[in-house]
Amino acid sequence: MCRHVAELDRLTELPISADLENGYGARPEDAAQAIRRAAEAGAVGGSIEDWDPEHGLYDREQAVERVHAAAEAANGLDFPFALTARAENHIRGNSHLEDTIERLQAFQAVGADVLYAPGLRNVAEIKAVCDAVSNPVKCRT
């Protein structure tokens, strides 16, 4: 990932936000390290998701700890870095909207700049998420 970010950074003046998947590990330190490495490669933003390809969704507490560590890493940089925290419920087979909202609220509380809930199914779900948080929301239906 870092090699691709560095290549893009070399080729364009546009700001780069990297999809950092789950931070390339389950520990909060892994999420923090992914932020630092992406920033070193030239990214000014990145996303961390609450899903692991081997084990599925992280429990909420672990997911929040990981986003908090990523936010602390982003805040420790010497330039602004936009952290997007992803609640993967809806695209991973758990369409429980209340849990998605609670995760996004917790991610916001620990420092995520942007909240992302891919897979919301309709305008009513998108509105419910947007009404429940104050930070910018990204969504994909």
Predicted regions and their residues:
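Alpha/beta enzyme core
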Residues: M1-C139
